[in-house]
Amino acid sequence: MDEDLDRLSQREREVLRLIARGYAYKEVAKELFISIKTVETHVSSVLRKLQLSNRHQLTRWATDRRLV
């Protein structure tokens, strides 16, 4: 498994996969039964841990690693 992926919590990985599939924050929240604010927090954490700047880079990162 990718070392960068190991840095993420299980929930962060779930959020990452859904965001990379094109889900909106509201859709991720509904799918995972969490608040939109919690989704935003997880996305910010993932971006920071992976040293990415935006959702586009996040999607590219996940696609390159065949997570979606």
Model features per residue range: what roles?
Residues 47-68:
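Basic, Lys/Arg-enriched C-terminal extension of HTH/homeodomain DNA-binding domains
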Residues 11, 42, 57:
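Short Gly/charged-rich anion-binding patches and loops
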Residues 1-38, 65:
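Helix-turn-helix DNA-binding segment
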Residues 31, 42-45:
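Residues within the DNA-recognition helix of helix-turn-helix
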